[in-house]
């Protein structure tokens, strides 16, 4: 436990030092993870799909996403409901705009910010933001989480569970070690809507989501 506290403190200090000497608003970078032949017999097709994903027409996505933004900028709240047996039920509180003609809550994120294109995002108002986020399967930093559930109140995680192990204690420890990193509370830093489904389709088609 003492080592975990030291690790959290070290990471926090390292982050502050990085931002002090390498300010985030003064640098930019792009990382593209191209597949290697070891990915399987479909390597040529998968490689072509990855190239396609990373060279989509960003102008088309920019127009689509601007329509989404203009609609969301008229809202104070966004309600997110899971489909079928997905238990997601979230309320996102948006910042109030004084003049929607001159102001916006959202970043129109295309290839000048991220490659591949495909999302609009904002930082929510923590007060009033809450509910449950349920993801049936997700990979974070190379680790799989099954039936991941995060419960939010006032925009912060107050409870959590997953179904990777047999006991609740093991599952909670897995989340604490690999998502929360032993912070007592983690705020919801971003609310985003993705528009690029090309990567998801390719991952499902070739069974490479875990690679």
Model-derived features: positions:
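Dual-mode signal for accessory low-complexity, basic/Gly-rich regions
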Residues: 159-211
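Short, solvent-exposed amphipathic alpha-helical segments in soluble enzyme
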Residues: 96-98, 149-153, 207-209
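Structured core elements
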Residues: 30, 79, 91, 132-134, ...
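A broad structural signal for short, well-ordered beta-strand segments within beta-sheet-rich domains
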Residues: 75-78, 145-147, 157, 188
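Sequence-level detector for tyrosine residue identity
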Residues: 21, 34, 58-61, 139, ...
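Active-site bordering "gate/hinge" segments
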Residues: 1-129
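Short, glycine-/Ser/Thr-/acidic-enriched flexible segments
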Residues: 36, 85, 97, 138-140, ...
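Long, well-ordered mid-to-C-terminal structural blocks that present hydrophobic/aromatic surfaces
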Residues: 125-182
């Amino acid at each position: 436990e003492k080592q975990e506290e030291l690790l959290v403190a070290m990471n926090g200090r390292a982050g502050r030092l990085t931002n002090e000497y390498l300010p985030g608003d003064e640098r930019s970078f792009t990382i593209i993870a191209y597949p290697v032949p070891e990915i399987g017999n479909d390597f040529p097709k998968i490689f072509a799909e990855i190239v396609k994903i990373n060279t989509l027409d960003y102008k088309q996505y920019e127009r689509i996403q601007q329509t989404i933004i203009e609609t969301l900028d008229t809202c104070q709240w966004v309600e997110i409901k899971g489909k079928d047996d997905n238990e997601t039920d979230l309320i996102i509180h948006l910042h109030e705009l004084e003049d929607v003609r001159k102001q916006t809550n959202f970043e129109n994120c295309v290839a000048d910010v991220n490659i591949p294109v495909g999302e609009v995002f904002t930082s929510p108002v923590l007060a009033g933001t809450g509910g449950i986020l349920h993801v049936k399967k997700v990979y974070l930093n190379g680790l799989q989480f099954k039936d991941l559930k995060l419960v939010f109140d006032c925009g912060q995680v107050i409870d959590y569970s997953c179904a990777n192990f047999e006991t609740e204690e093991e599952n909670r420890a897995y989340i604490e070690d690999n998502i929360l990193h032993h912070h007592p509370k983690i705020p919801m830093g971003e609310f985003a809507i993705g528009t690029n489904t090309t990567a998801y389709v390719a991952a499902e088609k070739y069974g490479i989501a875990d690679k």
